[in-house]
């Protein structure tokens, strides 16, 4: 959270000078749904979403600020948790979890969107639907 704030504070003057720019913060669906099993994590991700929306208000119209809220992503974290992953996938509308490239492509598309700011976009195979 602090890292995102300080990073934005460092780049905003340069973006304002060029009258253009986009910031995309990465949170989590836990910041939207909450997570009783990991309350500090969920609270910190909710703060990321709040920072994103506040920056969007403060920096418009020159700078667009959006956020991505991934659900489960196929990473090394799942090693040794194959049964848990299989169970989770079975509960998702799309019956799959995102690949890291899926998240990266979404971030790139948000950077290119000239008419979008202040939004938190989930990429969670329908988990929060």
Curated annotation (Swiss-Prot):
Cysteines engaged in disulfide bonds, as pairs: none
Native source organism of the sequence: Bacillus subtilis (strain 168)
InterPro entries in the cross-refs: NAD(P)-bd_dom_sf, Sc_DH/Rdtase_CS, SDR_fam
Annotated Pfam families: adh_short_C2 (PF13561)
One GO BP annotation of this record: fatty acid elongation
Family membership: Belongs to the short-chain dehydrogenases/reductases (SDR) family.
MF annotations from Gene Ontology: oxidoreductase activity, acting on the CH-OH group of donors, NAD or NADP as acceptor
Name under which the protein is recorded: Short-chain dehydrogenase/reductase homolog YusR
Organism lineage string: Bacteria, Bacillati, Bacillota, Bacilli, Bacillales
Top-rank taxon: Bacteria
